[in-house]
């Protein structure tokens, strides 16, 4: 087998017919500027071809289910293996998907609990065991010799009534004695029982003394007792001790029943095991009182009840007024000053008590009726669930929030699953073990106390769980819990989870293609990730990693630098060789940064800010340990800390949502905190994340930044357009008039091919230009509207240099380093980093008030060091205008450029959530307890 992957003539996207050789069974890093063509080479060429060749070997029937497998634009690729891609885009947003289900650890846990778990009565009556008649006989014979006993069959347990028919049936069946409420009676002499009291009735089946030769008689009596007692029997040993036995998993005292233990009982995705209240989601949509009564200092008359404030009719305010008058509640008293009973009446209704309601609507319709008062919470709930109107449902949804399910307490499972414990009654149930961090979970497995028999059964299962947890630990995810919803994971976290799953599969001879696995990972955990990658390589796999992280590049076996620029200025192989060889290559920008010839300088001075703060007190969501944090305004702030230390919780769940709630009246509830002050010092909150700028190909840089409006205005003012009577709408490809109707302005037509992938062909009428021929006859400076959309930002800047309004907006796109994208490039083809910078560009051309707060979560994702230098210049422009920029970041070049650092930690998960250090980078670098400070110190000295 050849030891290289040889690629000839790769032309996907911006690749310029390149030839490249990649050594097999090595750790290969592909790097280059954002947009240079790294992903085009790794994913759209190598992975796409490896995947396509595998799928081609399947039957036509199987192929139809595997979707799009186009042949990449490449002449030939030799030496390919089956390819597995681990990217960041395929995180499941399904609320039923958790870390445990994605890693398949849940499957093994379910097996463990089904095989060695013991159910315990939820009412505190001890272990629930199922015993056959044979096992019961053995246990009875093991009692001390000469023990006197009677065998009883329980037939009434804690039931009210006189039970006369039951005594008649017992007599008819030939039994002589019964025990009623602990006293023995002849069945014909039972006193009359009280109707209103609970009673226990057992039939005396036999009386015995434990001695040799009673096995046969005992066996018959036990079987008879089980038959009569519906699978239950009691042994009364005459010295006051009672033994309870059951054929079923059922508590002999209270009757709490557990089905046979099998893995499906412990699955929250199966009706058999899921919580009946929340259907296994762990959360339930409930009416949130804080949203229903946003201002408790208001009275009912002043509109304390938000859902019932008059919008289009006075129906509910009238009902409220008449009901309160009838029940004697003062409408002028502030809501918070009402008695508890009065508040309950307003919120949850009057039960069966009625009031007289009289209402005439605007159309003369009349209601004159005695009805119970519904209560505002009950009303919102009913209207949400019963309405057929999407509008009403959305309005009611605004007063509701996802709260932890009160039945299962967020564990997602029913009582029967949660009563099963491993390692005795004090051991955890499956819900509790899923709430542990991976590090604690590993420790618990070491300390699990099992009997010899249980240990033998559990050994292979525990090994599988232990191995998988260890892999997760090794890629820096020790702070995650198995119950964490997959949809809440960052791109880097979900990628490392899939990486851990792949390491666990122990495959060899596979080609793995990874997309920036170091995203969201602190420098401290980077070494463990690189070790994991090397482990995969040592199994005999080839790893191609698209990465910008300097440590990963230096530890790679082979480095490929794609460039020299981005977009049409990239797509060539600038350097290929060992990291040392690339570092010596003068043409390679990456090489210049690796060798230290190029670097991002440390700012000469730190800004002092405007002296104002936003202060949060008592932040206690997730793992935050009641923090008091001050965010100085007018500065560039970096929030740092190891993965899982609480950065996203503090910034995204608390600060961002609390500010949005005050500024934008946002209904999204912030995480737990005591108080927040200083919001009055800012006017705008701008969240700049990496989500796409548009979900359809109709959205593009020109439409997103608003420059397309100005360009269409310009075309509408040309002489030709005026003569023809064209307005600016004529130059939109989204509405009828100017667009090509054959393709509805898409420029392409989709042809469904069933057993082959869908084919997209350029529209035959407009040839991919989106507009009809009449519209394209209008020119500005000899270019029509379609030709303008095909221009790169750099070209458009020169073309529109005489029109300041347009040039200013296009300049901002160039300033964020996107000079290579075309104005009409579909938004769906932009990477996360490009989308984020496009959002920055659209902010740059807005007039600055100097009172904005910009929040960016890991803005360096997908960025080369050279791109980061450009990004920092843009962010510093915002701060120099008096605004505040807050980034969550691990990249040391960004951290060292900040004015103020808030470092959380010291560890992730339960070991984090504290402030380890705050201050300038120089101050944080001196704090010995700070991992960030340790790495920052080295960086500042460079």
From Swiss-Prot:
ATP binds at residues 32-39, 641-648. Its main location: cytoplasm. InterPro entries: AAA+_ATPase, ABC_transporter-like_ATP-bd, ABC_transporter-like_CS, P-loop_NTPase, UvrA, UvrA_DNA-bd, UvrA_inter. GO terms for cellular component: cytoplasm; excinuclease repair complex. A zinc finger (C4-type) spans 251-278, 740-766. GO terms for molecular function: ATP binding; ATP hydrolysis activity; DNA binding; excinuclease ABC activity; zinc ion binding. SUPFAM superfamilies: P-loop containing nucleoside triphosphate hydrolases. It is found in: Cytoplasm. Keywords: ATP-binding, Cytoplasm, DNA damage, DNA excision, DNA repair, DNA-binding, Excision nuclease, Metal-binding, Nucleotide-binding, Repeat, SOS response, Zinc, Zinc-finger. Residues 308-589, 609-937 form the ABC transporter domain. One of its GO terms (biological process) is nucleotide-excision repair. Forms a heterotetramer with UvrB during the search for lesions. The UvrABC repair system catalyzes the recognition and processing of DNA lesions. UvrA is an ATPase and a DNA-binding protein. A damage recognition complex composed of 2 UvrA and 2 UvrB subunits scans DNA for abnormalities. When the presence of a lesion has been verified by UvrB, the UvrA molecules dissociate. Belongs to the ABC transporter superfamily. UvrA family. This is UvrABC system protein A. The lineage of its organism: Bacteria, Bacillati, Bacillota, Bacilli, Lactobacillales.
């Amino acid at each position: 087998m050849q030891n290289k992957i040889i690629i000839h003539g790769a032309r996907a996207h911006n690749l310029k017919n390149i030839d490249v050789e990649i050594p097999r069974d090595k750790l290969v890093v592909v790097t280059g500027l954002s947009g240079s063509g790294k992903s085009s080479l790794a994913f759209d060429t190598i992975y796409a071809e490896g995947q396509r060749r595998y799928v081609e070997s399947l039957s036509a029937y199987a192929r139809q289910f595997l979707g799009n497998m186009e042949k990449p634009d490449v002449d030939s690729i030799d030496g390919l293996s089956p390819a597995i891609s681990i990217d960041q885009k395929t995180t499941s947003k399904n609320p039923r998907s958790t870390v445990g289900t994605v890693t398949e650890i849940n499957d093994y846990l379910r097996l463990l609990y089904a095989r060695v778990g013991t159910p315990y009565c939820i009412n505190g009556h001890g272990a629930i065991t199922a015993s056959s008649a044979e096992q019961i006989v053995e246990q009875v014979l093991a009692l001390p010799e000469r023990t006197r006993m009677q065998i009883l069959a329980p037939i009434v347990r804690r039931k009210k009534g006189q039970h006369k028919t039951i005594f008649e049936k017992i007599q008819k069946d030939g039994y002589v004695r019964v025990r009623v409420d602990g006293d023995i009676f002849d069945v014909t002499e039972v006193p009359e029982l009280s109707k209103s009291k609970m009673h226990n009735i057992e039939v005396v089946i036999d009386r015995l003394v434990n001695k040799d030769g009673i096995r046969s008689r005992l066996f018959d009596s036990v079987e008879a007792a089980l038959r009569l007692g519906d699978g239950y029997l009691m042994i009364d040993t005459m010295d006051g001790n009672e033994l309870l036995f059951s054929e079923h998993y059922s508590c002999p005292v209270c009757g709490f029943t557990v089905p046979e233990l099998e893995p499906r009982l412990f699955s929250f995705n199966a009706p058999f095991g899921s919580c009946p209240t929340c259907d296994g989601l762990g959360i339930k949509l409930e009416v949130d009182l804080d949203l229903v009564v946003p201002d408790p200092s208001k009275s009912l008359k002043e509109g304390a009840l938000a859902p019932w404030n008059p919008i289009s009719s006075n129906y509910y305010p009238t009902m409220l007024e008449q009901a309160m008058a009838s029940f004697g509640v003062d409408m002028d008293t502030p809501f918070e000053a009402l008695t508890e009973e009065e508040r309950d009446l307003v919120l949850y209704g009057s039960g069966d008590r009625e009031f007289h309601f009289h209402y005439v609507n605007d159309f003369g319709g009349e209601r004159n009726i005695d009805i119970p008062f519904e209560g505002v919470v009950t009303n919102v709930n009913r209207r949400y669930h019963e309405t057929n109107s999407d509008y009403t449902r959305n309005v009611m949804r605004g007063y509701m929030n996802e709260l932890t399910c009160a039945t299962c307490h967020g564990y997602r499972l029913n009582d029967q699953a949660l009563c099963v414990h491993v390692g005795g009654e004090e051991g955890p149930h499956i819900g509790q073990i899923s709430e542990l961090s991976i590090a604690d979970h590993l420790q618990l497995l070491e300390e699990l106390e099992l009997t010899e028999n249980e240990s033998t059964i559990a050994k292979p299962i525990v090994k599988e769980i232990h191995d998988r947890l260890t892999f997760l630990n090794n890629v820096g995810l020790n702070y995650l819990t198995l119950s964490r919803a997959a949809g809440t994971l960052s791109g880097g976290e979900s990628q490392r989870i899939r990486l851990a799953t792949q390491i666990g599969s122990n495959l060899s001879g596979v080609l793995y293609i990874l997309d920036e696995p170091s995203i969201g990972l602190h420098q401290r955990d980077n070494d463990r990730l690189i070790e994991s990658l090397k482990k995969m390589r040592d199994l005999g796999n080839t790893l191609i990693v698209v990465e910008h992280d300097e440590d990963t590049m230096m530890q790679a076996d082979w480095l490929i630098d794609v460039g020299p620029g981005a977009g049409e200025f990239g797509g060539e192989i600038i350097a290929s060789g060992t990291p040392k060889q690339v570092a010596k290559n003068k043409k390679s920008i990456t090489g210049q940064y690796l060798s230290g010839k190029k670097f991002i300088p440390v700012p000469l001075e730190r800004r002092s800010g405007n002296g104002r703060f936003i202060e949060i007190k008592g932040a206690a969501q997730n793992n935050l340990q009641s923090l008091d944090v001050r965010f100085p305004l007018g500065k560039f702030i970096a929030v740092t800390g190891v993965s899982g230390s609480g950065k996203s919780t503090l910034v995204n769940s608390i600060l961002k949502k609390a500010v949005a709630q005050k500024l934008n009246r946002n209904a999204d509830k912030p995480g737990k905190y005591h108080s927040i002050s200083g919001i009055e010092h800012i006017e705008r909150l701008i969240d700049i994340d990496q989500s796409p700028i548009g979900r359809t190909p109709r959205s593009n840089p020109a439409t997103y930044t608003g420059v397309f409006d100005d360009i269409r205005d310009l075309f509408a003012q040309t002489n030709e357009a005026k003569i023809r009577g064209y307005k600016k709408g004529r130059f939109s490809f989204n509405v009828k008039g100017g667009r090509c109707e054959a393709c509805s302005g898409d420029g392409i037509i989709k042809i469904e091919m069933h057993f082959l992938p869908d084919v997209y062909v350029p529209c035959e009428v407009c040839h991919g230009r989106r507009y009809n021929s009449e519209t394209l006859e209008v020119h500005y400076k000899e270019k029509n509207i379609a030709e303008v959309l095909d221009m790169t930002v750099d070209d458009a800047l020169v073309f529109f240099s005489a029109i300041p309004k347009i040039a200013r907006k296009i300049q901002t796109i160039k300033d964020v380093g996107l000079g290579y994208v075309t104005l009409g490039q579909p938004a769906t083809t932009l990477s996360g980093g490009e989308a984020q910078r496009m959002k920055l560009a659209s902010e740059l051309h807005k007039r600055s008030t100097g009172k904005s707060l910009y929040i960016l979560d890991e803005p360096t994702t997908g960025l080369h060091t050279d791109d980061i230098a450009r990004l920092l210049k843009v962010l510093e422009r915002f701060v120099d205008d008096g605004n505040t920029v807050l980034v969550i970041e691990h990249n040391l070049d960004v951290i060292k450029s900040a004015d103020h650092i808030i470092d959380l930690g010291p560890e992730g998960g339960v070991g984090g959530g504290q402030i380890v250090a705050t201050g300038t980078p120089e101050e944080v670098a001196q704090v010995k307890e700070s991992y960030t400070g340790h790495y920052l110190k080295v960086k500042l000295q460079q």
